[in-house]
Amino acid sequence: VTGTGVCHALRENGHRAILVDLFLGLEEVPADLETLFDAPDGLCPDAKIEVEAPDLETVKRGRKDQGPSHIGPHVLDICQKADLVFLGLHGMDGEDGRIQAALDLLGVPYTGAGHLASAVAMDKAVSKQILDACGIPTPKWRLLSYGLDEAEPLAQTLPMPCVIKTIGGGSSLGVYLPEDRAELKRALEEVLRYGAKVLAEERIYGRELTVAVLGDRWLPAVETVPAGKEFDYVAKYQAGAAVETCPADVPPAVMQAAGELALRTHRALGLEVYSRTDMILDKDGKLW
């Protein structure tokens, strides 16, 4: 959906843009790849977000080539024909520096942060170590690994309620908000499906703000109020599942502080071009 929106916007502004799925790629392409950029529809299908989180195994079965590569047929060949690759990707392989590194090795320019900063920002444990070192306020946290037998005894020492999340997830996938010990065990069982390392965080209650950084300046904060209890995958992508207010209805001093915090985070993690920092404004007026 992100890529489709970007592609349509670029084409409406006169650019020769096409949409290529990183994993599925294109099974059949013309001998002259540059002619793809003249496709009348930009190769953009009608895109929608399903109510349920994507089933990765089903997605994998959708590609004829069942090999181990995470990059679909002809993707890199097409990228090498482009003047610029606009990365509209989320999660593993898209935001974690892998595709960025591949494009760097091919000498293909792309949007967003480079491979190292992308990898650092995607790894929540590494990024939180950097934020702590830079004095940027972040909830108390603990890294739990490897497997339920090892993680559960450590988790039982955590104050409740807390936040349990995979260290490398995106789009609010792999994030759980257990309220008690029974929910904590179930959360660990679920989150360990995403990988062997689990991040446990102190739960901070308050208003959810998001601040984007573009270049070297921050943009007005956006406040998100989910229709349900939490801002999960559905609330993030389904129309009507959350109310987003921009600019957020906060005092000027809070807006300034949120912007400065986002810019500090952007610089601390070595990000470039653009980024987005999510934060909580607690009842005492502190930003996390």
Task: Identify what each model region corresponds to.
Residues 267-272:
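Short loop/turn motifs at secondary-structure junctions and domain boundaries
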Residues 1-8, 75-79, 118-207, 260:
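Active-site nucleotide/adenylate-binding loops and adjacent lid/helix of ATP-dependent enzymes
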Residues 277-279:
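Hydrophobic residue at the +6 position relative to the catalytic HRD Asp in the kinase catalytic loop
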Residues 111, 139-140, 219, 275, ...:
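A short, local hydrophobic-aromatic micro-motif
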Residues 176-260, 281-288:
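Phosphate-binding site of ATP-dependent enzymes
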Residues 1-116, 120-122, 126, 133, ...:
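ATP-binding N-terminal substructure of ATP-dependent carboxylate-amine bond-forming enzymes
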